[in-house]
């Protein structure tokens, strides 16, 4: 699996550290999570297709720690779920020469995410034209 794909999945729910504890669900070739921020102001779900993992549900308690552990690995990463008596206890990520073992959380310590009963009205409208897109693109930092 590409580490970049996993990092992209994580960044979409982690929101720069706003959401740390989530339940990941691996099923039918996809990885999904629903999330809620600690202050309950942000609620959402993220899904990644073409995920090569076994079917399981497991708790990721400290997403920042997980991303830091993944940062030491190369781009092509093998992913395994280690379990004891059928219960997932850790995630093992391995590239050619390095492996990391992330300990999973019990699902009872992961916040329950309620169903969204009604989508709120959106009150922000942003009009984009070629000038605003060009300006925004020019203000982005360049990679060195």
What does each model-identified segment do?
Residues 9, 31-33, 66, 133:
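Short, structured motif recognition centered on aromatic/hydrophobic residues
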Residues 29-33, 86-89:
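Short glycine/threonine-rich beta-strand-turn micro-motifs
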Residues 120-127:
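Surface-exposed, interaction-prone regions used to assemble/regulate multi-protein complexes
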Residues 34-58, 98-104:
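Extended intrinsically disordered, low-complexity coil regions enriched in Ser, Thr, Gly, Ala
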Residues 59-117:
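Hydrophobic, ordered structural segments
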Residues 137-144:
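Single conserved hydrophobic/aromatic residue that forms the stacking wall/gate
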Residues 24-26, 81-84, 128:
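Generic beta-strand structural signal
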Residues 1-28:
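An N-terminus-focused feature that recognizes amino-terminal "leader" regions
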């Amino acid at each position: 699996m590409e580490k970049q794909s996993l990092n992209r999945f994580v960044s979409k729910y982690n929101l720069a550290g706003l959401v740390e504890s989530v339940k990941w669900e691996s099923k039918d070739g996809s990885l999904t999570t629903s999330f809620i921020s600690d202050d309950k102001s942000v609620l959402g779900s993220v899904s990644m297709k073409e995920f090569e993992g076994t079917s399981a549900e497991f708790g990721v308690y400290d997403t920042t720690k997980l991303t830091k552990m993944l940062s030491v690995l190369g781009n092509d990463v093998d992913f395994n779920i280690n379990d004891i008596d059928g219960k997932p206890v850790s995630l093992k990520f391995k590239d050619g020469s390095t492996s990391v073992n992330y300990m999973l959380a019990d699902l009872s310590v992961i916040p329950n995410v309620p169903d969204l009963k009604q989508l709120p009205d959106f009150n922000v409208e942003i009009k984009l034209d070629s000038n605003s897109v060009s300006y925004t693109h020019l203000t982005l930092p360049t990679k060195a």
